Amino acid sequence: MKSTIFTPALNYLLRNDEKWCKAMGYFNPYLDPFKNHLRGSIPIYDLNSYRMYPNHNFVYDKLWVAQSQNLPAGELENLFTTTKKPNYPIFIKPRWGHLSAASKNCFKINNFDELSKYKHFKHMMWSEFVDGTEGMTDFIVLKGNIMHQITYKYSEKQNGFTDEYKYISSKTPTPKVISDWVTANLRDYTGIVNVQYRNNIIIEVGLRLARSGAYIIATDNHAILTNIYNVIDKNQWDYSLNDNMDFEPYYAFKCYTKMPIVYIWPQHILDLIVRSQTSRPFYEYYFEPVGREGMVFLQFMHDDLEKGMAIKKRIEFLFVLTQIITMILIVFTIVVLFSKWNCKYIFLIMMVLLYLTRFLNPHNTSYTLYKGQRQTIFGSGPPIGPEEITN
């Protein structure tokens, strides 16, 4: 994050976010609804995982991942100096997985003219464009042996590069080519491996659970969470728990909008909306830009696909309606300010106070929305490389 005059104040707010949430009575979706939790030294984020596993962090090199499968790929900058041209379309993205997130700086390129727009980008790679529905698997690995896996099945329909929902079940099998790749390339590894793929071609690998462990936590399964702790902190597996690692399947939905976001519901209003729709206790604001086309703004879970999709559409409609009403009120307030109405300043104060209720949320929620909007409007900027990261 670039330092500005607001950085100290922002850092203060983020450092004290937990105190703010407790004072305001905001629940923690990763802890409060569940009896069983992730514990011990399990890494949650990619950068932490990269540092925790120095002998296996080569998987964060997406170019190496592509080349390990004999997928046509290379460094982006080399395409501007070689006479050998790739077969379009190609896909370009940041090379280093621990230094990038979501779909930042990921583009489908159809010809050289489109490619030229990114000539100044460093630390990028290209590969053959792989079409098809995405899939993802979390592996629990002990000394190179896959002890357990949970595979996430993505919706066929997508908004840009993001799915509409995922189906999470302990019964969904992993494609054999994916598990074979993990076994072949991480022979002496112990920990978590998250693998994302399209048409059985691996596109990204991380040494941590998907979505900061949210999908595993939402199972509230004692056996799974205990054996994750056993593997990472004790270097062992409790086989007596194997018969208890099944869980009720569910769907994780992403709410998406193309409308500019000018207002978000206060946390307690969000609680009322979501809890009245689903009995699944995990939900959170989740801001994920989809290029410049729109943004994911919420994730929630449900046991039934049709009911969940209906809820998703209702929430998306309410959210768009909220943006429209907010925009109308902003325009109306500006018009009132230029009128001769005696109470216009009282009205202005009321409208400002009403608008500021959008900040009655965890500070991190407002910050992630700001980052997402900045990316949507201005782009991500060139990605960074390992030499630009300090401990």
Q: In which residue ranges do the predicted regions lie?
A:
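ATP-dependent carboxylate activation and anion-phosphoryl transfer catalytic cores
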Residues: 157, 172-341, 357-390
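Cytoplasmic C-terminal tails of single-pass
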Residues: 352-356
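Active-site nucleotide/adenylate-binding loops and adjacent lid/helix of ATP-dependent enzymes
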Residues: 45-181, 312-315
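Hydrophobic alpha-helical transmembrane segments
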Residues: 338-350
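Short, mixed-charge, low-aromatic patches
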Residues: 16-28, 131-140, 187
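ATP-binding N-terminal substructure of ATP-dependent carboxylate-amine bond-forming enzymes
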Residues: 1-67, 306, 313-323, 357-383
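Short loop/turn hinge sites at secondary-structure boundaries
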Residues: 37-41, 70, 79, 230-238, ...
